A protein has these predicted regions:
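Intrinsically disordered, low-complexity terminal tails and inter-domain linkers enriched
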Residues: 2-15
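C-terminal substrate-binding/catalytic lobe of Rossmann-fold NAD(P)-dependent oxidoreductases
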Residues: 18-22, 27-79, 158-279
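Short, ordered loop/turn segments at secondary-structure junctions
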Residues: 50, 113-115, 137-138, 167-169
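N-terminal Rossmann-like NAD(P) cofactor-binding module of classical short-chain dehydrogenase/reductase
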Residues: 85-86
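Short glycine-/small-residue-rich Rossmann-like dinucleotide-binding loops
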Residues: 89-90, 113, 219-221
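Rossmann-fold NAD(P)-binding glycine/threonine-rich loop
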Residues: 92-104, 111-134, 143-152
Length: 279
């Protein structure tokens, strides 16, 4: 239900955008606050956290490792305090953000992963009244990778076996990653394959030969890996691999901040990073 319009940088970026960060004390939230505070087009006006979070009441900038920004971590969002929200939390936190933004008619950027079918239905329903941009990965490189993976899969066909391997830090809770699933979905959309019928998660057993046309999916959890995604196309005698490596979470944060500025003033609907980047 993405509205069709030519992507362009929103004119509202010429004035200061008041931004709310949901999960501001989290790993991604801190980078959003830190980088957002450096952006001359933005003001981090609201830094949300769950009730009872020990850091509530402290300056969000200081918590994020930068200078004070005169915005305190809070569990409440006053009406009119922000013009858009970015959510990088967990599914339950994302649901709360969707309901809050719907009630206050705020544009919402969602970077939370691990969302269920019910969560996506909630997003679809909310997008009838507010603009929502949801993406498994906000980085420019990954969004180009999605397009490349789809093109290669379509051109090479089932003579080439597709395997997707994603690697993340040991603390990541959901598997496979939202980005890996997005890559698989891009391949399915381009080839007519089915996420339900053709996607195989790992392999275990004494006799499990690979089936023609299936898409293998594998998850690695180790150390402090920010994010690595590889899709390989293997045939007899050759293999083609496309890999994206994120060495810092800042690529996701910068993409989300860019998306939030772009989303201001857009009509209700569901958007993606493709709309922001004009892909």
């Amino acid at each position: 239900m993405t509205p069709s319009e030519t992507p362009s940088e929103n004119s509202s970026t010429n004035s200061l955008v008041l931004l709310a960060i949901n999960g501001a004390a989290g790993r991604m939230g801190r980078r959003l606050v830190a980088l957002g505070s450096e952006d001359p087009q933005l003001r981090i006006a609201v830094a949300l956290e769950v009730p009872g979070q020990p850091l509530i009441g402290q300056d969000a900038g200081v918590v994020s490792g930068v200078s004070a920004i005169n915005t305190l971590l809070s569990a409440e969002l006053a009406a009119g305090a922000a013009q858009a929200m970015i959510d990088f939390t967990v599914p339950v936190g994302c649901r709360a953000a969707i309901k809050l933004c719907t009630a206050q008619k705020l544009p919402l950027v969602i970077g939370t992963t691990g969302l269920t079918t019910d969560d996506h239905q909630l997003i679809d329903e909310a997008a009838k009244t507010i603009p929502i941009l949801q993406a498994a990965n906000m980085s420019l490189g990954v969004n180009f990778l999605l397009g490349l993976a789809a093109q290669v899969a379509q051109k090479l066909g089932d003579d080439y076996d597709i395997e997707i391997v994603e690697s993340h830090h040991r603390m990541k809770a959901d598997a496979p990653s939202g980005t890996a699933l997005a890559i698989a979905q891009a391949v399915c959309d381009a080839t007519g394959k089915s996420m339900k019928e053709d996607l195989v998660h790992g392999r275990l057993g004494a006799h499990i030969p690979r089936q023609r046309g299936e898409i293998g999916m594998h998850a690695v959890r180790s150390g402090d890996i920010v994010g690595k995604h590889t899709i390989s196309f293997g045939a007899i005698g050759e293999e083609l691999s496309l890999t994206h490596v994120a060495s810092t979470r800042d690529v996701f944060a910068r993409g989300a901040l860019r998306a939030a500025k772009w989303l201001i003033g857009k009509p209700a609907g569901r958007y993606s990073m493709k709309d922001v980047l004009g892909l």
